[in-house]
Amino acid sequence: DVVRFLNERYGMHMDAASTAADKRRIYLEMLEKEGMQPIREVVEFVHSLGDAPKAIATGSAMPGASRTLAAAGLSGLFDVILTPDEVEHGKPAPDMFLKAAELLGASPDRCVVFEDAEPGMKAAAAAGMDCVQVRRPSLS
């Protein structure tokens, strides 16, 4: 959607697939070189949930999602990891959250979404799920 917007708005001619691949590659290179600083409170909270069913519904492709979770010390703590490749419509459509609930065997009205971006908050509302906004310190 971003590539289409830029192409239309500024008369650019970027290919969406190759631009997305470049973005993923650059992100993984940066993660490898610079690491990441997870939000400590989020990491502590996820650990505090213990065996409660948990899912990640991320806009990232699986390689980036897996590496990010590992860098944050969260590998193996989620029962389900969903990426946009696994649903017909990504956020802000509710598809990812509804599929996550289904895979967890949970009713959407019993799920809570923790989200840091507006499209995800809209997706949670459309899925009929409660949503808690997570503010990223670097963007607050």
Question: In which residue ranges do the predicted regions lie?
Answer:
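Asp-based, Mg2+/Mn2+-dependent phosphohydrolase catalytic module
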Residues: 43-44, 48, 61-140
